[in-house]
Amino acid sequence: RLGMLVDLSHVSEATMNDVLDVTSAPVIFSHSSARALDNHPRNVPDAVLRRVAQNGGVVMVTFVPGFISQEIRDWSLARTAERDRLAALGGNDDQVAQGLTVWAEANPLPQASLSQVADHIAHIRDVAGIDHVGLGGDFDGIPSTIPGLDSVADYPGLLEELARRGWSDADLAKLAGANVLRVMRRVEAVAAEQAGEPANFAS
């Protein structure tokens, strides 16, 4: 009724499914990637990807390095474990920070790549379909970027990579914005259809 576009990027898997159980309008994930390629809880599992396809929604692949590279995800978990270990030894904040610096020198942060971003896009297309994948860089929410994807000015390089993998111009147009525009139009249509209906508090 409100024409609200529901974004599931910051929710748990249980909440993803709860929303998909009750919504009659398509949803989006504005900045999430494929959990099958990077087991981050903010990424979308294949089972949910299939439900998004049934719902008519779109998963917009993010460029957050830790959501793209499993190596970076593992590195972050290892760094957190080392921080907790140092804190448990009784070190103050400065000592813990110094210890983490030493640890990071011995364990350099891996880098994600543009090719890995393309892998996530391709995986979501393969599981959910070309009509249900988009781009959601999240440049304003990350401390570092992926080489070759520093801003929206670098999107052509990503599209070129996908074109090399066989994506058609029509596929790329859907990815680059047409899919999200379709969802927005459908959400507005559902709002108009339900404008006179009372709220359903049972669900």
Report the location of each language-model feature.
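Aromatic-lined glycan-binding groove of carbohydrate-active enzymes
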Residues: 45-99
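C-terminal helical cap
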Residues: 96-115, 119-122, 169-184
